[in-house]
């Protein structure tokens, strides 16, 4: 059993990290032609929510106004006006194609997320014994680290997640998740989440340090506060 315990964790850690990602990516690549064909062959050409439809209309109106303004300032004859409308039509077709590609990407990404979640759930249900071994191995590894390294690691992680420069990273990550699940970009909601998540994490961290680390390793707390100052 000790030998199994020593050899088992690394492969399981690698599989837990990479296997769900690899399975979801494989499914995504295999589903892409089918979903693309299904989407493009649908009788209804659009599948937009209200916010996305509003965004498309705004882009179309902006494009039309810019082209009209450009032609008016040139004082073009009627033939040029006809070319203008042909140009608007071509740009509209291009805009529809871009939106179709975005919708296909959203469907594929949601499918990949579901498959990844299902794979992790399968791990939790079918590989419970192996997860217990991995958990004990991680705890033993962390326990053998010195208090200085532990404090440095905590300080590094907290500075990355809730430090002065963390909002930009949170904005990119939340915006990416927001887009993956098919929601239209909303600056107010993303800004609200960016300003809320670090505060929640900071509160949880302080409670954890006060409630757990103070009881388990007071010296680690002292080193952490000294390095933080």
Swiss-Prot record:
Main localization, broad class: plastid
Membrane topology: Multi-pass membrane protein
TM stretches of this protein: 7-27, 106-126, 154-174, 189-209
Molecular-function GO terms, alphabetical: antiporter activity; proton transmembrane transporter activity
Family listed: Belongs to the CemA family.
Gene giving rise to this polypeptide: cemA
UniProt GO cellular component terms: chloroplast inner membrane
Function recorded in the entry: Contributes to K(+)/H(+) antiport activity by supporting proton efflux to control proton extrusion and homeostasis in chloroplasts in a light-dependent manner to modulate photosynthesis. Prevents excessive induction of non-photochemical quenching (NPQ) under continuous-light conditions. Indirectly promotes efficient inorganic carbon uptake into chloroplasts.
Localization of this protein: Plastid, Chloroplast inner membrane
Top-level taxon of the source organism: Eukaryota
InterPro entries associated with the record: CemA
PANTHER family: CHLOROPLAST ENVELOPE MEMBRANE PROTEIN, CHLOROPLAST ENVELOPE MEMBRANE PROTEIN-RELATED
Name of the protein in its database record: Potassium/proton antiporter CemA
Source organism of the structure: Piper cenocladum (Ant piper)
Catalytic activity: K(+)(in) + H(+)(out) = K(+)(out) + H(+)(in)
GO biological process, any: potassium ion transport
Alphabetically ordered keywords of this record: Antiport, Chloroplast, Hydrogen ion transport, Ion transport, Membrane, Plastid, Plastid inner membrane, Potassium, Potassium transport, Transmembrane, Transmembrane helix, Transport
């Amino acid at each position: 059993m000790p030998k199994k315990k020593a050899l088992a964790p690394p492969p399981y850690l690698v599989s837990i990290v990479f296997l769900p990602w690899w399975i979801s990516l494989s499914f995504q690549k295999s589903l892409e032609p089918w979903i693309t064909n299904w989407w493009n062959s649908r009788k209804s050409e659009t599948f937009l929510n209200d916010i996305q439809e509003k965004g498309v209309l705004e882009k179309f109106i902006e494009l039309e106004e810019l082209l009209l303004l450009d032609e008016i300032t040139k004082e073009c004859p009627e033939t040029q006006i006809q070319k203008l409308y042909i140009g608007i039509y071509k740009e509209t077709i291009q805009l529809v194609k871009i939106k179709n590609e975005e919708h296909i990407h959203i469907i594929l990404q949601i499918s990949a997320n579901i498959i990844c979640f299902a794979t992790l759930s399968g791990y939790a249900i079918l590989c419970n014994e192996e997860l217990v071994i991995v958990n004990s191995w991680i705890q033993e590894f962390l326990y053998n680290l010195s208090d200085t390294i532990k404090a440095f690691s905590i300080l590094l992680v907290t500075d990355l997640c809730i430090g002065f420069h963390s909002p930009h990273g949170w904005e990119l990550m939340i915006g990416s998740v927001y887009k993956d699940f098919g929601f239209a970009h909303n600056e107010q909601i993303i800004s609200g989440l960016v300003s809320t998540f670090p505060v929640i994490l900071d509160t949880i961290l302080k409670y954890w340090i006060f409630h757990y680390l103070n009881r388990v390793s007071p010296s680690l707390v002292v080193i952490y506060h000294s390095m933080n100052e």
